[in-house]
Every structure is written in C-alpha cells, then in structure tokens.
Regions:
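Periplasmic-binding protein-like
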Residues: 42, 119-126, 198, 202-237, ...
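C-terminal motif of bacterial Sec signal peptides marking the signal peptidase cleavage site
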Residues: 21-25
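Ligand-binding clefts/hinges and TM-proximal coupling segments of bilobed small-molecule sensing domains
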Residues: 28-30, 76, 152-170, 209-211, ...
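Extracytoplasmic small-molecule ligand-binding "clamshell" domains
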Residues: 32-100
Length: 258
C-alpha cells in the first residue's frame, strides 16, 4: 500500500473518531451535570420536612432545586440529624447544608455560608394552658426547657442551666419530640426558631403558644465546605437571580414565610 493510501486511511479514522466524540458530547449534555448532595434535618418545617409520600420537602428543598436549575447543576437530598450536618459537610458525605441553619460566627469557623436567605429568630413556646410563663424571664429554677441538639437554642438553655436560671436543659434530636413533650407537660417551655415554632402551632392547633418577643435575630444561610468558592458563587448567583425574577418570593409565599 502506498504512503498516500496509508495517509488517506489514517485521516478517515481520525475523522470518524472526531465525529464520534462530537456526538457523544452532544448526547451527554444535560445528563452529565454536576450532582451535589444536600443535607437537611427533616423535622424543621416549613424549611425542612417530609411529604405524605415520605420524600424530603419544604422551603429549602424547593429553594435548592430552583438554584440548581438556574445554575445548571443537579441536587440529591440526604436526611441527617441536625448535629451531624456540619460533620457530614466537612467529611464530604454531603456537599451542601440547606437546613434553616443560622450562619453564626462560631459556625463560620467551620463552614462557608451563602448570602442570607432568611432572617429568623428564637422564641419561647409553652403549653397553651400555661398562663404563668409570659416570657423567657418567667423561666426559673423549677423550669425544664427543651431545645434541639446542635442549635443555638440548645446552647442558650445549657448556659441557662449552668448559670442556675433553670432546673434542666432537655436536648432533643428532633423538634417534633420536644413539641410532644411540651404538649404533655414533660417540659415547661421550648426555645426554637420562630417560623418552625409557628408551623408546629398551626399543626397542633390550640396546644402550644408563643410567649414574649423574639430573643434574637438569626441570618440563615446555605453552607458549603470551607474554601469551596466555586460552589458558593453558584449558590449566591442562583439566589440573586431567583430574587430578581420573583421566584424567591413565590417560594416564601408557598411555605408561609413571607
């Protein structure tokens, strides 16, 4: 075979490979989007909950789906204990924390947070039949106070117990268990985020109530691993675009957060 024939045959093979690669690239578009694992604790409505099918649901789920769509990536949701969210993020078990988490200075030492997506605050809730406790100042050395593990409210009541201001700080893995004990009188009060407490009030009509003013202000953020600027930028850009388009406000309204 002549050199020219060899050259023609070689060129044909190269062209065929190039065409194949082009078709493969086109065919994989969309199916090859980056997938990020999002961790959340599902007893924190309306931010994080489960629907009637048992699937993770809530404002944070809808928000992350909308950000992912806007920024061209995909998300998978994982249910974790609240206390394990930051640990899971640092270990690489999850890529994102979207669970109504306060971007506190202490947490910022371990996590990079997005721009604020919601301003919340802690409130005191009591049994609806309790007319003695009207604010946090009415909690005393006979009071058993509940909070969820790993939260700012847990830190607060543990400090109150240490200082002798309350009898016992009862820490729960899940908020709904704390609400149940509040209803049956096992604890005197529950300290928790206002939107979440209001959601449980609506579900348990006439059984619990909020007393006094909010105790603080907490800016909620979406967390990523320290130094993951690429992912953080995507989340912040997505948030900004959703707010600009009006989609963010629609989600707030859907979950009664407006």
């Amino acid at each position: 075979m002549s050199f020219k024939k060899h050259l023609k045959k070689f060129s044909a093979v190269i062209c065929a490979v190039a065409i194949c690669m082009a078709f493969t690239a086109c065919g994989s578009k969309g199916s090859g989007d980056k997938v990020y694992k999002v961790g959340m604790e599902p007893t924190f409505p309306p931010f994080d909950t489960t629907n009637e099918k048992g699937d993770l649901d809530g404002f944070d789920v809808d928000l992350m789906k909308a950000i992912a769509k806007d920024q061209g990536f995909k998300v998978e949701f994982k249910s974790l204990e609240f206390e394990g969210l930051i640990t899971g993020l640092k270990s690489g078990n999850i890529d994102i924390v979207a669970s109504g988490m306060w971007a506190s200075d202490e947490r910022k030492k371990e996590v990079d947070f997005s721009n604020t997506y919601y301003e919340s605050g802690l409130v005191v809730a009591v049994n609806a039949n309790d007319n003695k406790i009207k604010s946090i100042d009415d909690l005393d050395k006979n009071s058993k106070v509940a909070a969820q593990i790993g939260t700012s409210s847990a830190e607060l009541i543990q400090k109150m117990q240490k200082e002798g201001k309350i009898k016992e700080a009862k820490i729960y893995n899940k908020v709904n268990d704390a609400v149940q004990d509040l209803q049956n009188g096992s604890v005197s009060a529950l300290i928790n985020d206002k939107p979440v407490t209001k959601e449980y009030m609506n579900k348990q009509k006439g059984k619990i109530k909020i007393v006094g003013d909010p105790l603080n202000k907490e800016n909620l953020g979406i967390g990523v691993q320290k130094g993951n600027k690429e992912l953080l930028d995507k989340i912040n850009k997505g948030l900004a675009n959703l707010k600009k388009s009006g989609e963010f406000d629609k989600l707030l309204k859907k979950w009664n957060l407006n």
